């Protein structure tokens, strides 16, 4: 069924709670892809792959599939930046449904660690982004309350959070006329980790004014609830604006969700305390028997302090290290994660699956190696090893019906596919670039002449090399021959990288040389030529997937072309050339059959740079990095002031979801602390 809201058609489907705002009808390969994926889900296929080329509208296809199936969906993205983009797009498609954002809520995180070689213990240090914490709590609330939910998440979703059973047991249901003692209500709020604050009323707090209790729900950023009591009875429930105090809506019932995912009923905490004491007794005895008296004293002192806090307050610093006891799990059992909150019929979309799947697989071992040191030297009990991300095989067992989304699916997707659905034809009519193979022996001189030809008509060139040395030498050679050129490599941080791309688009230089130009964000419409040097050197940077990804960088220009410099055609080259040619044939045939004339993508320069680059800064030469500030001459007072300023900037950028800017402020903070205090602030080497 189709209706219209503000001139945007709204599409609904039978038995689906989703209302899809459809600014344009599906085009190109989208209609067939949507139909096939929806059929596959209906037929019960556990795994499907959407092979969608760059610029083919994969997010739009996902939104259509979700709307047709009418089931809650989890969309897994490889990083925060891409997750934020997907979140914004899904909110445009589903403004009337629950689109949620679940990523790590740390602006800054330094994990607890011990470096035996230096006898250095590094305390856990972190800065939590309150806005993202609220969004995480909102995500789990939506899953418990409704079916029309889309959650965009990063790999953070495989890390342990509170057990959904305990979380659900702590929910407070309020109804008009319900009998509950004023004191009991306050105690329930404290048990749910709400803080009483009669002066600073903010998210996750409550205040008491006579018989009136105001609660600012942890998962809500805009509205609070007023509970008016009379003689141990809930007389009125009202939503109000916590800033102005204006009443918004009278309620008959209201549900208050816990202030944290880690809340635990009192009975469970007391039971866990006894289990922790038993483990402490065994561990301390083992250390003493082994002659490790320092470790025995250390584990006793640290754990006894935590036990006292748990007994008195119901939580302690580092409570996640006792999650096995608190959730009643056995040794080695997987922790509860966001996936446990999903209903059994949920859908999982793994975006950029060739990156996301290996990322999920790599989390467990890195976390384990750090914790083994903490356990071995008496800083933590062995049960802390079970506070961990999911192992890959555990993640696999929990995966609901899954759709992998990628332009270059990897081996895992090939081994787990009920069907592969192609989305090769772009709605814009653009076709993949033509490919030339030329001899590697004359690659530099040939590249120089090709670059001059492109520059003469106002187009840009990307060049990818195998080594950093080659990139630097080639940059120098091209510069000596009058080409405006810069290079990009791993030593350049996020913000500098974005600045370089901005300058390339603005025409401040014409050729960009790099080693691995596959990373998200390098879709530059002005680029008409991609040159791959030494394309016949088999390896990670010249694999079939890497070549296809690199060739695709020229796919947004009507004159797009890729040149592979090689003396022999390798298996990877042949596969990449054949795949690109297959796509071109299909795209050209579709355009001819439908009378579509391709045109270069028009994208405002600020679209790539928004939220990252602030203001025009004059930069000359081939280096865009500003010299780092000099801190050696600062006195103690100035250093402290600078640290506070940088921390404030970092938190402000993270609050605005400007993760690149937040990362730049964080790195500057690291440098300042390291130069001032002579300590490595990054944690373990």
UniProtKB/Swiss-Prot annotation:
The gene is uvrB. GO terms for molecular function: ATP binding; ATP hydrolysis activity; DNA binding; excinuclease ABC activity. PROSITE patterns: HELICASE_ATP_BIND_1 (PS51192), HELICASE_CTER (PS51194), UVR (PS50151). The UvrABC repair system catalyzes the recognition and processing of DNA lesions. A damage recognition complex composed of 2 UvrA and 2 UvrB subunits scans DNA for abnormalities. Upon binding of the UvrA(2)B(2) complex to a putative damaged site, the DNA wraps around one UvrB monomer. DNA wrap is dependent on ATP binding by UvrB and probably causes local melting of the DNA helix, facilitating insertion of UvrB beta-hairpin between the DNA strands. Then UvrB probes one DNA strand for the presence of a lesion. It comes from Aromatoleum aromaticum (strain DSM 19018 / LMG 30748 / EbN1). SMART domains: DEXDc (SM00487), HELICc (SM00490). This is UvrABC system protein B. It comes from the Bacteria. Residues 39-420 form the Helicase ATP-binding domain. A motif (Beta-hairpin) lies at residues 105-128. GO terms for cellular component: cytoplasm; excinuclease repair complex. InterPro entries: Helicase/UvrB_N, Helicase_ATP-bd, Helicase_C-like, P-loop_NTPase, UVR_dom, UVR_dom_sf, UvrB, UvrB_inter. The beta-hairpin motif is involved in DNA binding. Residues 443-596 form the Helicase C-terminal domain. Belongs to the UvrB family.
